[in-house]
Regions:
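Active-site metal-binding motif and surrounding structural segment of the metallo-beta-lactamase
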Residues: 41-86
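Short internal beta-strands
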Residues: 80-88, 207, 246-247
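Active-site metal-binding loops of divalent metal-dependent hydrolases
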Residues: 58, 88, 187-189, 210-211, ...
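Binuclear metal-ion centers of metallo-dependent hydrolases, dominated by the metallo-beta-lactamase
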Residues: 107, 111-119, 192-279
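Conserved beta-strand hairpin/beta-sheet module of binuclear metal-dependent hydrolase folds
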Residues: 1-51, 141-145, 151-152, 175-186, ...
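Metal-dependent catalytic neighborhoods of phosphoester/phosphodiester hydrolases
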Residues: 65-72, 96, 255-264
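Active-site-proximal loop/helix segment associated with metal-binding centers of metalloenzymes
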Residues: 127-201, 205-214
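Active-site neighborhood of divalent metal-dependent phosphoester bond hydrolases
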Residues: 79-81, 88-114, 253
Length: 279
């Protein structure tokens, strides 16, 4: 297998998280079981098989591999991918792809779909993604992937199968939708992204940026530029209901040993063993 970029993996329950994220370098994630990826700052070779991607914002470390991904799928005779982008980015992205097509003398077949806060992206009968507003220096979004199931309404649960069938035949809606948050994704954002989107804190797995950790950094400046500090996690530690919390997008000024030391000083139990540092 070709390994052109770093990829780390974590499996929890029935979901696999794969990817890499370092601030100003590149960010890319995918969940193979959901056939879904987040952000296209880089494109590991085997990630091209994932047909649907959602881009949180348009800084280059989150979108630079857009033409590479589309071109590879065309070259390998795969179906055109579906890519969700901030709606203001659709026009510029189309222009960029046209110019890369001219340079490469090839087509760039894909479906680009604009998103805004409040949207619901239907991936399948079982999966839907809700879009929330993040806070960054460019328009940015966060996402929750929900599993959808239909269950018999409470008032009909004691009825026989024949009676339920008759109700259905008479046009009565006997079931209702239940949603279960599987994965939350917060790309670049100040802590307002968490505060405004509490469903992120309920997802089975949360992937969140944690760009800054050093005690001496000024949090107000960090927040102004749309990022988070370790203190922001510590202040919200009682709010996390997630089974796993993946912290990533660390600043390149830090050595991995420094990151682990600062986290262990402030969160010695790693939030009950649920916190994973993507180093």
């Amino acid at each position: 297998m070709v390994q052109n970029l770093p990829v780390k993996r974590l499996t929890h329950d029935n979901l696999t998280i794969e990817g890499y994220s370092r601030a100003a370098v590149q960010t890319y994630w995918r969940i193979p079981e959901l056939k879904l990826g987040f952000d296209l700052g880089g494109q590991p070779w085997d990630f091209m098989g994932t047909p649907t991607w959602i881009v949180s914002h348009t800084h280059l470390d989150h979108i630079a591999a857009l033409p590479v991904y589309i071109s590879r799928r065309r070259m390998m005779k795969m179906d055109p991918p579906r890519i969700y982008l901030p709606e203001d980015a659709i026009g510029p992205a189309q222009q960029i792809l046209r110019q890369f097509g001219r340079l490469d003398r090839s087509r760039m077949p894909c479906e680009l779909i604009g998103i805004r806060a409040g949207d619901e992206l239907v991936l399948s009968r079982e999966l839907v993604v809700t879009v929330g507003a993040a806070t960054h220096t460019v328009p940015a979004f966060c996402f929750v992937v929900w599993q959808r199931r239909r269950k018999l309404k409470l008032e009909f649960q004691n009825l026989s199968g024949d009676k339920i069938r008759d109700l259905r035949l008479n046009g009565t809606e006997v079931s209702e939708e239940h949603r279960y948050p599987l994965v939350g994704y917060l790309g670049d954002s100040s802590p307002e992204g968490l505060d405004r989107n509490p469903d992120l804190l309920r997802a089975k797995i949360l992937i969140t940026e944690l760009t800054f950790l050093a005690p001496g950094h000024r949090k107000e400046k960090i927040h102004k530029h749309g990022h988070m500090h370790l203190d922001d996690l510590v202040e919200r530690v009682d709010q996390f209901q997630n089974e796993k919390i993946i912290a990533a997008h660390f600043s390149t000024r830090y050595h991995p040993r420094q990151i682990e030391q600062w986290v262990d000083e402030r969160l010695p139990d790693r939030i009950g063993g649920r916190l994973e540092l993507w180093l």
